[in-house]
A protein has these predicted regions:
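Conserved acetyl-CoA-binding loop-helix of GNAT-fold acetyltransferases
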Residues: 77-80, 86-99, 126
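Conserved active-site alpha-helix within GNAT-family acetyltransferase domains
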Residues: 91, 115-133, 138
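Helix-loop element at the rim of GNAT/NAT acetyltransferase active sites that forms part
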Residues: 16-30
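Conserved GNAT acetyl-CoA-binding A-motif
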Residues: 94, 101-112
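Conserved beta-strand in the GNAT
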Residues: 47, 53-62, 79
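A short beta-loop-alpha structural element at the N-terminal edge
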Residues: 1-15
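Active-site rim helix/loop that mediates acceptor-substrate recognition in acyltransferases
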Residues: 27-45
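Glycine-rich phosphate/pyrophosphate-binding loop shared by adenosine-nucleotide-utilizing enzymes
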Residues: 2, 52-57, 73
């Protein structure tokens, strides 16, 4: 059974494993811990669990944006364990985040995903999101 819970420090290792799985690399654990510390203080983090195993997580940022004349929620990260794909975990996390954002008074929700993640694009469309913007990046 999968349940949604708010982030706890005991969730760090499970989320670390999912981030490495998503990016197909092994990140430095100390550096990742520092990133976690920042995320904990500045974002809302929701996780899904099956017994004690973390099956997915979502990081949500809420900011005031002048061009929306209000608060906007942004899904900074959404990841579901490969072993738990196609079980509605991503949909549950996304719906939970949308409900939370509405309760916080957000007027919009934004999500950015890499162009190569075609499955993610289909997922977001199925869940009612529209592809309306371009995002430009430059590695520093």
């Amino acid at each position: 059974m999968v349940i949604l819970v708010n982030f706890r420090l005991t969730s760090l290792e499970g989320i670390y494993q999912l981030v490495c799985q998503l990016e197909k690399t092994v990140f430095d654990q100390e550096a990742m811990y520092e990133v976690f510390q920042h995320a904990i203080l500045n974002h809302s983090i929701f996780i899904s669990k099956d017994n004690d195993r973390i099956t997915g997580y979502l990081v949500l940022s809420i900011t005031y944006q002048m061009h929306h004349c209000g608060k906007v929620a942004e899904v900074v990260e959404l990841c579901v364990d490969n072993d738990f794909q196609n079980q509605k975990i991503g949909t549950d996390l996304l719906n939970h985040a949308m409900t939370y954002a509405k309760l916080q008074g957000c007027v919009n929700m934004d999500i950015t995903t890499n162009q190569k993640r075609k499955d993610a694009h289909r997922f977001y469309r199925r869940n009612g999101l529209n592809n309306t913007h371009y995002k430009f990046t430059k590695q520093l």
